[in-house]
């Protein structure tokens, strides 16, 4: 009885980010579409060869995307937003939807990018589909079918992957009031019927249809819609219904009624669901078990997994499939490239290529292959050895964590009192202007960083180079007349990796890249041991920048929850414990910054929303320790020290009270793409502190006009008292260039100055009317 082995998807970026560099060359006009497509084809061919060489039963097709797989589905369904429809859709259409289009690059008019948000609770992003009641769907984008043909012609047995119709609808948004996007399902299903019919003609036996929303707590109309949907799209192609990121037990009674041929569940995220799934699995279905974790870098304990799966194999026989838990796009590509790791540390890890081999090894061992069973035993030994490694567990760190009290997570006085102290010290105008932290990482900075890391630049030479970039950033900000400055973070390759490199307990990699969105890749550090700060990290750079200006300089820290969410965490201790260790380290940094004369300190927490568990019933437990971790970090600040925090891609409605519970003096948030829609959360909740809703979408090359910014700030002022508003971009400016950055910030500053005058006139008029009324009554 041969066990079928497969994965849900493979990284598309290339082991050395080949796709990223090709995309960016294309966007700069340095290569044409044919050259870009050639790079994509080469990457797909290599990925399929990796899967086939390892011995997987299927090569997965359709997991490749030029920007993100949800946007690919949008193009597949012919569902391009009207503002981006210019002739027959091609790659430029796809990039316009994802990146937007400025007037200068379009003969007609500019067009805003579609919203972008996080893919469930990961650090991957997708472009949000837009729905209106007139929408139709038509299969017009051939990428999926072309890639199936490519794989077949290369000699592979193919399993295409497709985002399911219910998940596609659910992950989108209505762009008009009084309309429910679920009513579009019948039209959408017609397109899915056409897709499956085409795949059948191509000789496809199995298709993987991803419905990750089945791991959520779905409302009844959405859950009920599944039965009809899968009856309608039933075809000659067998369907593996794929779920991941959490348990599907809540939806299981509906799932087992569906007209599909198999179910995939994520046992890495929710191992407890196995018994319930086995008890209700239809007799004619296959069961794919995701036992190799696609979201981390840790070597799988294949010995333990084998012991767990053997009874399932005995019960199901060939109906048992072994798989990755989710797509491997969340893992780096290949551990073999990491020549700088010690043999011990290397033995702890497995990247995507190695995870493919783990899946195959488990399949062979389940089939009774003696050599594979023995290999499982040997392969798992480093995991056991690590549990007792003395350098992984530190008594000093454990002692501090054990001493945490409620008082440690509280500022010394309430916000109202802090605000008075801060107003006296900072002397800021109405609608103060600032940026979120980073400035463009120029090619010069990257070359110098590379030269330093390769030994071509000494530490002293590199420090002088960085000081030059900091001085330049300060000079540019003063010329723009921003109110609160930043040093620009020239020394930081990444907002998380930089702290990981300067905190004990982390391991960084050279090629551990994963895709975040589009061409944006991140290289998450790995938590390998207890975390502690051995010396100040940012104080020197911030104090140098402050010495160059009389304006206020913000110290810039990445918060404990974001560092946790944007790294690969340990699996031997809880996420809460890691967050507490990080919080204590950052608390020490806050103390040192204020002692060095930095009056404003930003503790970025852009990832706090994405860290929420998928099930709402699990939210409060997470929020309790996540908010505590932030407050521990910030609570060493004196009343006159203003603590800022920043969040992006956040949906605040469900966590607005928790955002307030952070007790940050100022919060800046991403709102420009949604045209200030995110501020609806503040209509019913009286947010007590200051807020800076973003007015410049830094993810798009478009430069916002002064009028656009004025309009956004006025919308914000309808929900937030103007005296508590700040004016700032959505996010850091690292990925932009200096000309567009300065142009956008010039408009931002001029908009703020114009609005100060307008609001001052309104205030004067109101005061005059009030005075006249008093005099009349007198």
Curated annotation (Swiss-Prot):
**For L-methionine, which residues are the binding ones?**
436-438, 489, 604
Pathway participation: Amino-acid biosynthesis; L-methionine biosynthesis via de novo pathway; L-methionine from L-homocysteine (MetE route): step 1/1
Which Pfam families has this protein been placed in? Meth_synt_1 (PF08267), Meth_synt_2 (PF01717)
Name one process (GO BP) from the record. methionine biosynthetic process
Cofactor(s) needed: Zn(2+)
Per UniProt, which keywords does this protein have?
Answer: Amino-acid biosynthesis, Metal-binding, Methionine biosynthesis, Methyltransferase, Repeat, Transferase, Zinc
Known PANTHER family for this protein?
5-METHYLTETRAHYDROPTEROYLTRIGLUTAMATE--HOMOCYSTEINE METHYLTRANSFERASE (PTHR30519)
Indicate what this protein is called per its UniProt record.
Answer: 5-methyltetrahydropteroyltriglutamate--homocysteine methyltransferase
Q: Which organism is it from?
A: Vibrio vulnificus (strain YJ016)
Q: What is the lineage of its organism?
A: Bacteria, Pseudomonadati, Pseudomonadota, Gammaproteobacteria, Vibrionales
């Amino acid at each position: 009885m041969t066990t079928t082995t497969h994965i849900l998807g493979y990284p598309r970026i290339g082991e050395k980010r080949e796709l990223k560099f090709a995309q960016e060359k294309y966007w700069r006009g340095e290569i044409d579409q044919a050259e870009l497509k050639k790079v994509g084809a080469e990457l797909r061919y290599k990925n399929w060869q990796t899967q086939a060489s390892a011995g997987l039963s299927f090569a997965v097709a359709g997991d490749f995307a030029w920007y993100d797989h949800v946007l690919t589905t949008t193009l597949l369904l012919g569902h391009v937003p009207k503002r981006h429809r210019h002739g027959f859709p091609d790659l430029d259409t796809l990039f316009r939807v994802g990146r937007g289009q400025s007037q200068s690059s379009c003969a007609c008019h500019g067009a805003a990018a579609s919203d972008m948000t996080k893919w469930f609770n990961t650090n991957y992003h997708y472009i949000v589909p837009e729905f209106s009641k007139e929408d139709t769907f038509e299969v017009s984008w051939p990428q999926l079918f072309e890639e199936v043909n490519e794989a077949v012609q290369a000699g592979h047995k193919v399993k295409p992957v497709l985002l399911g119709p219910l998940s596609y609808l659910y992950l989108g948004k209505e762009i008009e009031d009084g309309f429910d996007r679920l009513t579009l399902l019948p039209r959408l299903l017609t397109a899915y019927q056409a897709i499956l019919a085409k795949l059948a003609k191509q000789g496809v036996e199995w298709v993987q249809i991803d419905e990750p929303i089945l791991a959520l707590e779905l409302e009844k109309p959405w859950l009920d819609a599944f039965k009809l949907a899968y009856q309608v799209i039933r075809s000659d192609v067998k369907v593996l219904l794929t779920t991941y990121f959490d348990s599907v037990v809540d939806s299981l009674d509906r799932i087992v009624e569906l007209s599909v041929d198999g179910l995939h569940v994520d046992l890495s995220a929710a191992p407890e669901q196995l018994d319930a799934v086995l008890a209700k699995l239809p007799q004619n279905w296959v069961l794919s078990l995701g036992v190799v974790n696609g979201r981390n870098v840790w070597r799988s304990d294949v010995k333990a997994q084998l012991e767990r799966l053997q009874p399932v194999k005995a019960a199901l026989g060939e109906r048992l499939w072994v798989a990755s838990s989710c797509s491997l796009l969340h893992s780096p590509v290949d551990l073999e490239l990491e020549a700088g790791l010690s043999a011990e540390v290397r033995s702890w890890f497995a990247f995507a290529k190695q995870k493919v081999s783990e899946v195959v090894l488990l399949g062979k061992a389940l089939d009774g292959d003696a050599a594979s069973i023995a290999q499982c035993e040997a392969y798992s030994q480093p995991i056991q050895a690590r549990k007792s490694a003395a350098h992984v567990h530190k008594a000093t760190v454990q002692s501090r964590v054990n001493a945490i009290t409620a008082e440690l997570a509280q500022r010394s006085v309430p916000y109202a009192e802090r605000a008075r102290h801060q107003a006296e010290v900072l002397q800021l105008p109405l609608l103060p202007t600032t940026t979120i932290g980073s400035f463009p990482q120029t090619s010069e900075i990257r070359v110098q960083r590379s030269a330093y890391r390769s030994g071509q630049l000494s530490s002293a030479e590199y420090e002088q180079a960085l000081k030059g970039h900091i001085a330049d950033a300060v000079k540019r900000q003063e010329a723009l007349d921003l109110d609160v400055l930043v040093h620009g973070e020239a020394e930081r390759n990444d907002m998380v990796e930089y702290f990981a490199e300067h905190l004990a307990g982390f391991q960084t990699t050279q090629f551990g890249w994963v895709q975040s969105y589009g061409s944006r890749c991140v290289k998450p550090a790995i938590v390998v041991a207890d975390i502690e700060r051995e010396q100040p990290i940012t104080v020197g750079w911030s104090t140098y920048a402050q010495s160059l200006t009389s304006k206020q300089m913000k110290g810039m820290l990445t918060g404990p929850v974001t560092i946790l969410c944007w790294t690969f965490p340990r699996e031997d201790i809880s996420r809460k414990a890691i967050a507490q260790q990080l919080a204590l380290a950052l608390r020490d940094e806050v103390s040192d910054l204020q002692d060095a004369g930095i009056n404003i300190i930003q503790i970025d927490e852009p990832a706090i929303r994405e860290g929420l568990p998928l099930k709402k019933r699990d939210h409060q437990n997470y929020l309790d320790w996540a908010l505590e971790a932030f407050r521990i970090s910030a609570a060493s600040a004196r009343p006159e020290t203003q603590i800022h925090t920043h969040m992006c891609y956040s949906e605040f409605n469900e966590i607005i009270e928790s955002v307030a519970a952070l007790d940050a003096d100022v919060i800046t948030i991403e709102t420009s793409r949604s045209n200030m829609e995110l501020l609806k959360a503040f209509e019913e909740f009286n947010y007590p502190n200051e807020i800076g809703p973003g007015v410049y979408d830094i993810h798009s090359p478009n430069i916002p006009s002064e009028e656009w910014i004025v309009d956004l700030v006025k919308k914000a002022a309808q929900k937030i008292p103007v005296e508590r508003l700040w004016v700032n971009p959505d996010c850091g400016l690292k990925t932009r260039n200096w000309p567009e950055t300065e142009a956008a910030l010039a408009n931002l500053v001029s908009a703020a100055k114009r609005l100060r005058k307008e609001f001052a006139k309104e205030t004067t008029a109101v005061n005059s009317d009030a005075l006249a009324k008093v005099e009349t009554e007198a």
